[in-house]
């Protein structure tokens, strides 16, 4: 069976696939023009959505496509076909995302960046740090990744609130509500963690009105999608001191232009879309599991609903 592999890390994936499934014929690379000549001979494509979207503009769609990213926004672009099965990466990002969130929550509570700045100025900073114990953390987007983040945070003694597509009981959350209730829940949260996907309903969500409902001094972390935030409104909220800080892993435009105000906004930290890199080993395992399911005409993990966008 021939598999088209469109990935910047194609050599790594090809090696892992050859070791785990030597019967597969892998056609790999990261040059769309070169791959386009082979795409028609491959019923299955594996790779990163930006490269796969480029191939879809040149070639007929495959029978099945496996994304190596959790987000599949490039494949939802206007004019691209949707008459194929698409699965996205699931089950491979939970722990690394939880570690990312925990890193910056603790850094904020313990005033890490403030102490680094003080050291650079030879100032003895003895301001007491905080603790996660007793804090209320709101996770906006409690799918597979959000659930894993919650499980990591629960032992720290936090109270967990969540936003999902439907209100439901979902341990370890004390409450899970719908997006319509977000303004009410942010008023109760000491820390707000955004993990929402890119859908029409999540664009410009964090605007001046919503940011104005945040608890004074709250920390905002966005590792979902940059389009969820109205940039100018977040800058204004930070400059006015209404928020305790913001950590942004994602932005509307990446890389962020040098003239963008995020670079110089006080209390804002940029982490360059590094929160949850794909593990090639975990991704290879997921692909092979889905390949078995595909061949057996069984349900596959991470199947995308094109209407919902995830």
How should each PLM-predicted stretch be described?
Residues 1-44:
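N-terminal glycine-/charge-rich "phosphate-binding" loop or analogous flexible N-terminal tail
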Residues 36-40, 56-59, 132, 183-187, ...:
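A short, aliphatic-rich alpha-helical micro-motif
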Residues 114-148, 175:
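Glycine-rich NAD(P)-binding loop of Rossmann-like domains
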């Amino acid at each position: 069976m021939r598999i088209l592999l469109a990935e910047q890390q194609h050599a790594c994936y090809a090696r892992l696939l050859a070791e785990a499934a030597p019967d597969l014929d892998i056609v790999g690379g990261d040059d769309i023009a070169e791959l386009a000549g082979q795409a028609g001979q491959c019923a299955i494509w594996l790779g990163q959505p930006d490269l796969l979207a480029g191939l879809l503009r040149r070639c007929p769609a495959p029978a099945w496509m496996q994304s190596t990213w959790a987000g599949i926004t490039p494949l939802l672009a206007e004019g691209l076909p949707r008459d194929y099965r698409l699965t996205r990466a699931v089950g491979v990002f939970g722990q690394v995302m939880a570690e990312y969130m925990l890193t910056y929550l603790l850094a904020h509570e313990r005033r890490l960046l403030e102490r680094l700045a003080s050291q650079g100025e030879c100032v003895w900073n003895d301001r007491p740090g905080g603790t996660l114990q007793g804090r209320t953390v709101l996770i906006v987007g409690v799918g597979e990744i959000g659930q894993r983040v919650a499980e990591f945070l629960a032992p720290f003694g936090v109270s967990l609130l969540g936003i999902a597509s439907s209100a439901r009981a979902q341990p370890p959350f004390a409450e899970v509500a719908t997006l319509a209730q977000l303004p009410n829940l942010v008023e109760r949260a000491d820390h707000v963690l955004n993990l929402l996907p890119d859908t029409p309903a999540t664009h410009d969500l964090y605007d001046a009105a919503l940011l104005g409902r945040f608890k004074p001094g709250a920390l905002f972390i966005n590792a979902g999608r940059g389009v969820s935030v109205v940039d100018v409104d977040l800058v204004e909220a930070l400059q006015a001191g209404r928020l305790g800080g913001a950590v942004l892993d994602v932005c509307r435009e990446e890389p962020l232009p040098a003239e963008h105000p995020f670079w110089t906004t006080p209390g804002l930290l940029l982490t360059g879309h590094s929160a949850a890199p794909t593990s090639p080993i975990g991704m290879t395992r997921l692909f092979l599991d889905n390949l078995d399911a595909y061949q057996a005409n069984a349900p596959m993990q991470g199947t995308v609903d094109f209407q919902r966008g995830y």
